[in-house]
């Protein structure tokens, strides 16, 4: 971690981008290395924006969704394809070589399905989306063959549906970064399920069920060979599970805290107000967790078996809650986006190249930026279950 930790400690603002129209920045994805160097950002006004990753200049925008966006991700083997999912019941694929054009693929399932999470497998072959709960009963994992050309929707390309593993909104879907058949899903029912899709149907594919004890907000694969799962809950709980222990008698839980906000207090005492998310730093083989305060202050923390350790506090950037971040290992840069509509690029020893001081948002602008798509649910009723090594375990 030493080399990366030194870089994190030296971060300062290098670039700053603000849209003409105020909006919340909800999620960010980086185009795979070796391409034209694009960042995709999902916004609370249902648009997807493309930025140059080095200058943050806006290079394009996609409009087509009519509901809250639940994420964006670039394909790996076809990095000119960008996917976005939405509560409007569609997952759309865009060609980033033609900014502003219509989606080249539109994936749908049942008209009653509203997606609140999605992901693409590491082989780009399989697409999966998690739905909101329907009629206070069912929620679904929907699978498509992403290689089939689907325009106009209509449910074309749907391979199947899992319907028994969650009992509430499926807030997270995460494919394993290296294993195309390994999938993790998280829900407001408090459960994180791990599937091996090569094993057959839903019951056979379910390898483990872990209980977060609260509504699941974020799930990330991490650790050596990505054998661990980081789970952050909507009420700021943190859980780290080692799936490498599935076939042993050792416990899965590496670390667990029902409220992680005070685990790594900054110099002025207290703790963070919320957790933004986590990211596995491949080059350093360490897990980075980012937390923040409502005034925009950010705290970079390392997470391991001992809990959280503060690495760096970033100030003078955002003016309100930060909603997304990513670490660009090749570019040695941190990218953050938030409810103040700002996209920031932090680099070691960076000197801000945009003119003028940080513009404080007026209360009127803040109100204008609020929308149903931007409201992050902080707690939901959940069912109590212990984790299981597989579905047949007691």
Language-model regions, residue ranges each:
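Loop/turn-rich, solvent-exposed surfaces of beta-rich toroidal or solenoidal domains
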Residues: 232-236, 257-307
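WD40/WD-repeat beta-propeller blade N-cap
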Residues: 16-25, 62-69, 107-115, 162-170, ...
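Beta-strand-rich domains and repeat architectures in extracellular enzymes and scaffolds
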Residues: 18-44, 276-277
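WD40/WD-repeat beta-propeller blade-loop signature
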Residues: 24, 35, 58, 68, ...
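Conserved strand-to-loop turn within each blade of WD40 beta-propeller repeats
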Residues: 42-45, 85-88, 96, 123, ...
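A short helix->beta-strand "capping" segment at the edge of beta-propeller domains
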Residues: 2-24, 55, 307-314
């Amino acid at each position: 971690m030493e080399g990366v930790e030194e870089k994190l400690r030296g971060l300062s603002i290098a670039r700053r981008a603000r849209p003409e129209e105020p909006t919340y920045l909800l999620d960010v994805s980086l185009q795979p290395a070796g391409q034209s160097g694009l960042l995709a950002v999902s916004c609370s006004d249902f648009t997807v924006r493309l930025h140059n990753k080095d200058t943050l200049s806006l290079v394009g925008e996609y409009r087509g969704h009519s509901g809250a966006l639940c994420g964006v991700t670039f394909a790996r083997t076809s990095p000119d394809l960008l996917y976005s999912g939405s509560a409007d019941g569609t997952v759309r694929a865009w060609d980033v070589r033609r900014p502003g054009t219509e989606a080249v693929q539109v994936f749908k399932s049942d008209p009653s399905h509203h997606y609140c999470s999605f992901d693409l497998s590491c082989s780009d072959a399989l697409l999966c989306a998690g739905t909101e709960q329907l009629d206070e009963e069912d929620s679904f994992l929907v699978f498509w063959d992403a290689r089939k050309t689907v325009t106009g929707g209509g449910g074309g390309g749907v391979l199947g549906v899992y319907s028994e593993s969650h009992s509430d909104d499926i807030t997270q879907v995460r494919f394993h970064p290296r294993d195309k058949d390994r999938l993790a899903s998280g829900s407001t029912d408090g459960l994180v399920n791990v599937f091996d899709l090569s094993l057959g149907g839903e019951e056979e594919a379910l390898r483990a069920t872990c209980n977060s004890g609260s509504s699941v907000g974020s799930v990330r694969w991490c650790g050596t060979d990505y054998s661990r799962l980081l789970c952050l809950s909507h009420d700021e709980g943190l859980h780290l599970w080692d799936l490498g222990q599935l076939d042993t008698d050792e416990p899965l839980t590496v670390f667990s805290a029902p409220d992680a906000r005070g685990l790594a207090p900054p110099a002025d005492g207290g703790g963070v107000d919320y957790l933004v998310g986590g990211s596995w730093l491949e080059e350093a083989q360490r897990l980075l967790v980012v937390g923040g305060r409502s005034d925009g202050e950010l705290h970079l923390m390392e997470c391991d078996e001992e809990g959280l350790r503060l690495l760096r506090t970033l100030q003078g950037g955002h003016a309100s809650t930060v909603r997304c971040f990513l670490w660009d290992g090749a570019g040695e840069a941190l990218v953050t986006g938030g409810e103040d509509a700002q996209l920031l690029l932090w680099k070691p020893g960076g000197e801000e190249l945009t003119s003028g001081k940080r513009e404080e948002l007026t209360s009127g602008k803040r109100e204008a930026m609020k929308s149903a798509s931007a409201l992050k649910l902080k707690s939901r009723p959940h069912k109590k279950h212990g984790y299981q090594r597989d579905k047949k375990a007691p």
